[in-house]
Amino acid sequence: VAKLYNMLEGDAGTTSMGRTAVDNETVRTVYVIRPDKRIGLFLTYPMTTGRNFGEILRAIDSMQRTAKHKIATPADWKPGEKVIIVPKVTNDEAKKIYPDGWETIKPYLRKVPDPHK
């Protein structure tokens, strides 16, 4: 996959044999490819820092929810926690989508339960 997306030099070979960590440094970037073949997220880690798979999975959970619902996820959000109704959704439209209502923090910040529960 790294070769397919040109993350390694063209002459890097077809296997990892003979390559060092320095040769593979460009693969320190994590890409999440959406179903439409576009990059949905990329995170680049220094060679000295391990990847945080919990964060990668959290971001994927967020992207899946926000693709299906008119929501956004707040900072430090975890699956199952409240989400934000995107500002472009009017209150009238929100009443149809969320008949049980929502918590209003600011006019542009309305929270509802995670629809994926």
Language-model-derived ranges and their functions:
Residues 1-117:
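Chalcogenol-based redox active-site neighborhoods
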